[in-house]
Amino acid sequence: MQNATIDQLPVSWQEQLPLCWREQLKEEWSKPYMQQLLIFLKQEYKEHTVYPEENCVFSALRSTPFDQVRVVILGQDPYPGKGQAHGLSFSVPEGQRLPPSLINIFRELKTDLGIENHKGCLQSWANQGILLLNTVLTVRAGEPFSHAGKGWELFTDAIVTKLIQERTHIIFVLWGAAARKKCELLFNSKHQHAVLSSPHPSPLAAHRGFFGCSHFSKINYLLNKLNKPMINWKLP
């Protein structure tokens, strides 16, 4: 796979990448890091259990087209437990037990806006223009951060950079160190975007400033100022 192109991705992945995002990211596929990432992923999926399933790796991009992104919520890497990861940051499929970070997200949402959610699938948020993007898009089962440093960070950097350069008035929500690291891209940008930052909602960090951040009401305040529809945070 020395001259990797998008056509050499597994078919299920290619089908999950919408044409709008494929066009925006077309230059990434011939870069050396992508060639190495594809080789690594091919081997990982062959020899280990990897999450999410291949047809869900690009679920965030599939769910929120490039020209419809209004908010970006950056996560870290997918949940490493069986059945949890489905390609949207912080989200779990219907019927899955809520992970601790998502419990804390819902706790803050209730404190902020009085909204209670009990199901963990955030698909309706994605459908409203929230790009639920992890910094790293795959993980080996039971091994958090096992796919960090393999190339995904460069790919998601490219996603964020494209949004910064080609779009205006996007709200970037940065929870945790990995997300804040990407904020360096924003600080170097002269384009008009908003940034909301806090510690990660995990139990280890939430009490350091995630609780009380009021990001959900702040997002809707900013959207309202831009005459854009506000987010309905209540899950169906």
From Swiss-Prot:
It holds the Pfam family UDG. Keywords: Cytoplasm, DNA damage, DNA repair, Hydrolase. It catalyses: Hydrolyzes single-stranded DNA or mismatched double-stranded DNA and polynucleotides, releasing free uracil. Transmembrane segments: none annotated. The keyword tRNA processing does not apply. GO terms for molecular function: uracil DNA N-glycosylase activity. This is Uracil-DNA glycosylase. The gene is ung.
